[in-house]
């Protein structure tokens, strides 16, 4: 996962499960919120070669778009119920607005109502079959349901789309899904591909480090988790992983430094509690 609808680097609590919204204007563009909506009949009727302008946007679509922007803002802030209220108004204004059905799917995915999420993503695809971001989201939903073969196949279909430009997001989600399915070799391969496209992404860095730590490849795990912990995106989870990696390498100085940062910056965290109890293998 994230914006377009993708994984978000600024809020990565729950690193092992990540389909989050991306940020700002890119999110709105990915939803089809910005500018005229080329999928609407009115927009399609504009003469070939003409520039689509705000005047081409039907009134109902404009109302739906504004409501969708509000819903998205609330969703990103974690106000899921308020986001759903705004989204309902968007769909009342324009029931065939594909981006609204996509966001509806994400909302119900967050609420773990998988049947409604599935219905919403599939409705969005009926309205706009070429939207790779919706196909990505549906693949992630299937992953949450542990429908591994279907999920992997849909991720691969997204990645095979020649016009798709969010490879980092989808390789990351595919790798996370494969890790959940116990396919560590494939997971590592796809997380590394994601890392090639987006080397600073904290979700990728953490999960690569965690995967390598679990299989005993401590030097490579150290390389990834150190990069993360030296960035402003470090958190309790990454510090704790760093502590365990350095402990495995018998690097006492680095282990102490990370331990101090963990306790100082995140004193009430579960990871800080585990450290103080010496629960390194939980």
Indicate where each model-derived feature is located.
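Structural marker of alpha-solenoid helical repeat scaffolds
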Residues: 59, 93, 127, 161-163, ...
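TPR alpha-solenoid repeat register
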Residues: 100, 134, 168-170, 204, ...
């Amino acid at each position: 996962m994230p914006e377009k609808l993708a994984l978000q680097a600024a809020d990565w609590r729950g690193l092992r499960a990540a389909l989050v919204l991306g940020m700002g204007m890119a999110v709105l563009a990915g939803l089809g919120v910005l500018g005229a909506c080329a999928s609407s009949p009115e927009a399609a009727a504009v003469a070939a070669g003409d520039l689509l302008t705000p005047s081409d946007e039907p009134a109902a679509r404009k109302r739906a778009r504004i409501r969708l922007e509000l819903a998205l803002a609330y969703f990103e802030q974690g106000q899921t119920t308020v986001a759903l209220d705004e989204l309902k108004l968007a769909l009342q204004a324009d029931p065939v607005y594909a981006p609204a059905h996509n966001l509806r799917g994400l909302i119900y995915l967050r609420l773990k109502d998988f049947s409604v999420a599935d219905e919403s993503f599939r409705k969005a695809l009926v309205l706009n079959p070429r939207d790779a971001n919706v196909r990505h989201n549906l693949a992630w939903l299937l992953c949450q349901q542990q429908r591994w073969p279907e999920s992997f196949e849909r991720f691969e279909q997204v990645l095979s789309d020649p016009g798709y430009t969010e490879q980092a997001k989808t390789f990351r989600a595919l790798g996370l899904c494969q890790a959940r399915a116990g396919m560590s070799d494939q997971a590592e391969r796809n997380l590394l591909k994601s890392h090639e496209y987006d080397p600073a992404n904290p979700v990728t860095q953490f999960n690569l480090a965690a995967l390598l730590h679990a299989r005993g490849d401590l030097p490579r795990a150290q390389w990834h988790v150190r990069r993360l912990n030296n960035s402003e995106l470090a958190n309790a989870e990454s510090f704790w992983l760093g502590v365990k990696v350095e402990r495995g390498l018998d690097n006492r100085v680095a282990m102490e430094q990370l331990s101090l940062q963990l306790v100082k910056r995140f004193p009430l965290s579960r990871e800080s509690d585990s450290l103080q109890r010496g629960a390194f293998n939980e």
